[in-house]
């Protein structure tokens, strides 16, 4: 099994995506392949309501079909995958560039503390606990702050997040969107 997962991981190469790492570790999400004995194509599928699908290796129409009917962002590894997606879905898709933030960085804790200290009195910064986990699930805009975790227990075990409250209502948050051994993918949302 470890050898096969190594083969699958090699299909993704050094693609710097936390969501892929999360799926490969088996913590969250799923990995699908064209052939379990000798995989040539792989799909890292992540999400619970809306999804990301990272497509790697040789383009494979069957893996692409697994994504049908989902609210999904497909992320092709190369032009060959892009061509298959465009050939399969034509004008039913919208292509766009997805930008990532810098992954290997450090926080200026002093600057963060100044921002917290400058928060107006009527706002409170709180760590996401059981009650705030549930509060984040109530409204669509805040669901991604916790919604990719199977339940509150998984979030408290693997995740991390903070929200800003105004009059006891969640108005903004920063939280783990995905968790892997080396870190988290961060989701930031603010009520519109």
Q: Where does each model-flagged region fall?
A:
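A short secondary-structure junction signal
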Residues: 136-139, 187-188
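Short, solvent-exposed secondary-structure boundary motifs
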Residues: 20-36, 54-56, 152-154, 166-167
């Amino acid at each position: 099994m470890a050898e096969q997962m190594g083969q699958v991981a090699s299909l993704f190469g050094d693609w710097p995506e936390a969501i892929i790492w999360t799926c490969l570790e088996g913590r969250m999400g799923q990995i699908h392949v064209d052939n379990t004995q000798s995989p040539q194509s792989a799909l890292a599928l992540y999400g619970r309501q809306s999804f990301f699908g990272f497509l790697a290796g040789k383009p494979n129409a069957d893996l692409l079909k697994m994504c049908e009917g989902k609210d999904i962002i497909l992320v092709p590894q190369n032009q060959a995958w892009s061509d298959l997606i465009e050939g399969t879905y034509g004008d039913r898709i919208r292509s766009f560039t997805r930008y990532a933030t810098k992954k290997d960085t450090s926080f200026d804790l002093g600057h963060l503390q100044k921002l917290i200290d400058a928060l107006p009195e009527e706002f409170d910064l709180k760590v996401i606990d059981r009650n705030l986990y549930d509060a984040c699930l109530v409204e669509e805009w805040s669901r991604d702050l916790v919604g990719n975790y199977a339940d509150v227990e998984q979030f408290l075990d693997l995740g991390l997040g903070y929200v800003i409250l105004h009059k006891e209502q969640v108005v903004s948050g920063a939280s783990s969107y995905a968790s892997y051994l080396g870190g988290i993918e961060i989701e930031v949302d603010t009520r519109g």
